[in-house]
Amino acid sequence: MHAATEQLVRIPVDTGLIEGALEWPPESQGLVLFAHGSGSSRHSPRNNHVARVLRERGLATLLVDLLTPEEDRVYATRFDIPLLTQRLLDVTDWARRQPATALLPMGYFGASTGAAAALSAAASQGAGIRAVVSRGGRPDLAPARDLARVQCPTLLLVGACDEEVLALNRCAVAHMPGPTHLTIVPGATHLFEEPGTLEAVARLAADWFAQHLPTRGAPSGAQ
């Protein structure tokens, strides 16, 4: 297997630049954009583990900090779902302009609060986003009107021991009209720190994206 190509990127937003890591294996079959939870970053070991498994399955990945360093120092900003949603949309637009990713079908992987931003962004993108996976997500933080507009296949992964978040996800399923599946990971708490649980998340996410991201092209390089 050939190694993935890695590129550190800087993406312009309204208040400056945000940074990310774009990696694509040869003949990538799709691109997954990651939205991490509050207090985390693109260096999140959990998201990077999932991203590595996705690349092994032939998918390109883009892990990005949706806030500038200055914004991230303000605690309340980490929970500003409209801002995080707009940033994810900015990243999506940027990815569609890059030769490495322009032709690839796209999906979102959101963790915790990042899942709310991923769902809201998917709602506004319509058919432009082909699939969403949420890990321990907080769909309750997304506006109800956005949940009602999510049409793409969505996989909600929640730990069996994460009782509060599990209840929130069960409620969200009832408000989402698109194909939505809630999978409970046995023995897992919110951070999926228990042996084998994060591996299960990565496998389930890879299977979901492989099923729902149709082949449309292969990358040639990024700017």
Question: Residue locations for each model-derived region?
Answer:
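Catalytic active-site module of serine/aspartate enzymes centered on a nucleophile-bearing elbow/loop
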Residues: 188, 196-223
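A conserved short beta-strand
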Residues: 127-139
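Short beta-strand immediately N-terminal to the catalytic nucleophile in serine-hydrolase-like folds
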Residues: 107-110, 135
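Serine-hydrolase catalytic machinery in alpha/beta-hydrolase-like enzymes
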Residues: 8-104, 191-196, 200-201
